[in-house]
Amino acid sequence: MIGLILRLYPPRYRQDLGEEILAVYRLTAADASRTGRFREAADIAAHAVRMRLGLSSATAAGRLLASAAPYAVGAAAAGCGVHVTRWYAGVVASPSPAHLSLLSADTWTALLLASALVVVGAITALTGRWHGGVIAVVAGLSGLAAATVVSGAAFGDPVITPAMALLTALIVLACPPDLRPGPRACAAAGATAAVAWLPLVAVQAHVLPFSTDYGLWPLLVLAATGLVLALRSKSPGLKEAAAMTVACPPFLAYAYTGGWDMSLPVLAIGAAVPLTGAMAAYAYHLVQRGRGRAERAGLR
């Protein structure tokens, strides 16, 4: 089996390092259980696929995915958190006991449990246990995608919602393991998720007297996050905008189902909103560069 896995590597990489990888695997698997050997082989296969696709920490694509991964996790948590709080609001308003809705083995229950798993996994990942949290997030998103296809319009569009859920899972999985997000990035992603989620819950609970976001509020939050990150790092904002764009599939699904149910406007806005933040950050960068030139000219 390990021989077939090694074939996943690019030919040049396999020629240079294939024997070394094989030797390390045999040494590690010698005293390992069957589960341990399977896990080691799975890790090698994942690394081989990343190298084949150019998604390692040495490539720009890999670094982009690493920057986007915590925000993708936060976006998934915010979207699924809306499902969970919507269910809770229904339970509060219903005269039936809460446990009866959970004990009924139907598609709605599967959707709810998958959403709860995503939320718990995201909290786990963003509070320091990234690997275990990501496993829960990916499992929850996969379950959500499957249940949404079966349920129809219960939790969203039967095509767009599962497609965006699976795309988010792939984005999170593709993050290079040696570029796991640090505490600051995780804290920022958690704050972004909270700011995206809380007003939506307030609107559903009729705490706010109006609702005019048409599904776009979470995308606006991502754009603002990219702008803030660009301003803090004093960069043109292109990297931050790209990361926010990669992280936005869960919010695109929400905009599609919670807004107009029209794919073209939502996709256009999903691409334009993060880029608006990049343009604003780039304008700030140009102003700062102009000031620097003026100061240097004044010193001459």
Set out the residue ranges of the language-model regions.
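Disordered, charged N-terminal biogenesis/targeting segments of membrane/secreted proteins
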Residues: 1-31
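Hydrophobic alpha-helical bundles in membrane proteins
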Residues: 62-300
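Cytosolic juxtamembrane regions of integral membrane proteins
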Residues: 19-96
